[in-house]
A protein has these predicted regions:
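Conserved ABC ATPase "signature" region
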Residues: 109, 113, 120-137
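Helix-to-loop junction immediately C-terminal to a conserved catalytic motif
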Residues: 57
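Short coil-to-beta microelement around the adenine-binding A-loop and adjacent beta1/P-loop entry
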Residues: 23-24, 81
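The feature captures the beta-strand-to-loop junction immediately N-terminal to the Walker
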Residues: 42-44
């Protein structure tokens, strides 16, 4: 993948390998995502999408390979803790835990409150998400 001059990679992984007992989830995966890009990961069940995303989000320790996220090594506990609040990750199945009586905006706002964000911070982040995903009303 070539980058546009001035772009930084927000995610860069190389030679990732991950196993669950006898099942290979990731086999020598390398990927670079430039900043200011929206991507989608599409594929059948069991090909490693959730495993890759959980490593990038820092919720799963990588077994081998390298993962650089937001300019640092996501395997480093100190770095991971320092950027955790800047990474949004909704694991597969967790969507069942959203509140059906709340709108999407109300659900996002609710979880922002759980993480201690001020009303101003939540409003800023929600507005930013809506703009960056072209979902603004």
């Amino acid at each position: 993948m070539t980058s546009v001059p001035g772009d930084e990679f927000v995610v860069s992984v190389s030679n990732l390998n991950q196993r669950y007992r006898n099942t290979i989830a990731l086999d020598d995966v390398s990927l670079a995502i430039p900043s200011r890009r929206m991507i989608g990961m599409i594929g059948p069940d069991g090909v490693g999408k959730s495993t890759l995303l959980s490593i990038v989000a820092g919720v799963r320790h990588l077994q081998s390979g390298q993962a650089t996220v937001l300019g640092g090594n996501i395997a480093d506990t100190g770095f991971r803790n320092s950027v955790a609040s800047r990474i949004a990750y909704l694991p597969q199945g967790l969507g069942k835990n959203l509140y059906p009586t709340l709108s999407v905006l109300e659900n996002v706002d609710f979880f922002g409150r759980l993480f201690g964000q001020s009303a101003e911070e939540r409003a800023f982040r929600i507005d930013d998400l809506l703009r960056s995903t072209d979902l603004e009303p």
